[in-house]
Amino acid sequence: MSKLGVLLTICLLLFPITALPMDGDQPADRLAERMQDNISSEEHPFEKRQRLCCGFPKSCRSRQCKPHRCCGR
């Protein structure tokens, strides 16, 4: 009986139950969750910063704004 317990312990250590994929871990489910979060590129902080940086001609001279991304260059 103790040999069976040792074998079971070794098997559980080598292949834990947490290694099995669960239903909530599927990529399709994660995509649906991201879509529900309503995070679009319009609301993304990086996009917002880039738009603010390139909003006026005088801001194109700032160090944060790269001229090749805005001001028609």
Curated annotation (Swiss-Prot):
Residues 20-49 form a propeptide. The keyword Signal applies. One of its GO terms (molecular function) is sodium channel inhibitor activity. Changing R63A: Decrease in affinity to channel. InterPro entries: Conotoxin, Conotoxin_mu-typ. It holds the Pfam family Conotoxin. Disulfide bonds join C53-C65, C53-C70, C54-C70, C54-C71, C60-C65, C60-C71. The cysteine framework is III (CC-C-C-CC). Mu-conotoxins block voltage-gated sodium channels (Nav). This toxin potently blocks rNav1.4/SCN4A (IC(50)=36-41 nM). It also moderately blocks rNav1.1/SCN1A (IC(50)=120 nM), rNav1.2/SCN2A (IC(50)=620 nM), rNav1.3/SCN3A (IC(50)=3.2 uM), mNav1.6/SCN8A (IC(50)=100 nM). This inhibition is reversible. The block of Nav1.1, Nav1.2, and Nav1.6 is modified when beta-subunits are coexpressed with alpha subunits. This is Mu-conotoxin PIIIA.
